[in-house]
Amino acid sequence: MLFLASLAAVTEAEKTSPLRCGHFGASGLSERHLSCGDFAGVLSTWDLERLATPVWQAQAHGGIINAMDAMGGARRGYGAPEIVTGGRDGRVCVRDPRQHDAPVAAFEPPEGLEAVPDCWTVAFGDSHCDGDRSVLAGYDNGDVKLFDLRNGQVRWERNLKNGVCAAEFDRRDIAMNKCAVATLEGKFHVFDMRTHNKERGGYAGVEEKFPTGATLWGCTHLPQNRDLWMVGGGDGTVSLYKYAYPDQRRATDADGKEYGVTGEVRCLTYRQLSTQPINCWDWSADKEGLAVCGSFDQSVRVVICSRLSRQ
């Protein structure tokens, strides 16, 4: 069941360039610096108690910064604090906030393209030791790419035939398990990231169609249960889905090579929250079922989803 709650603004600040995305993930629990990307391609970090000037800023992209993810600031898990951004210029850039003048990794769009695809979403994952971390990126032309930060190269890519609005690993601080990818025209995909088979297109995946066909703006996994995630729809609905693993997650083909086997996806519940798209959703890491979401109706809503531990 879904319940609505209310909240009040604590502080406000207006900036010259509109802000497109933001994240606390590269900040420590004590300082709580907010990293933001704007329409001018500037990446900046703000102290919420001193909003007059940024702590630091850098020109990260040649156009709008469409998406951002960050991790490592809370000193939990593995790896340095890092911020990854995806922009209209098609670039994916990774920055360490401690040395922010230049990216520690940058993945450029292929040369010779008539039109450079926008990068619409980025997500960290596979951060299971100090030496490993990957980035999952989705583009407006339907491409989804997995970048290996250790080797600085594309580890896997696939075209889903619809613009990729959101992508997320079920857990980013473990060896890759599975990921969810949401696209235009009401489709989302779940890929099993444990077994790679090049001849079969890389990782096995299952595709689901949203009943209304509305654009899916986000897919956010529950921190307390990686097999549950919320999907935000362009029709103003949110839907809670569950993934059921198969009896065996891998099989062997006639050549003796292993390939992944996908499970099943089912919708547990849904709720109409707005008449406008639900474009962002974030779960509380401390309180199971507590979440906040944003919508194109310029409203921010606090939501409580109950009985999740029984699913």
Where are these regions (language model features)?
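Blade/loop signatures of beta-propeller domains
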Residues: 1, 254, 258-259
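Short, small-residue-enriched loops and turns at beta-alpha junctions
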Residues: 153
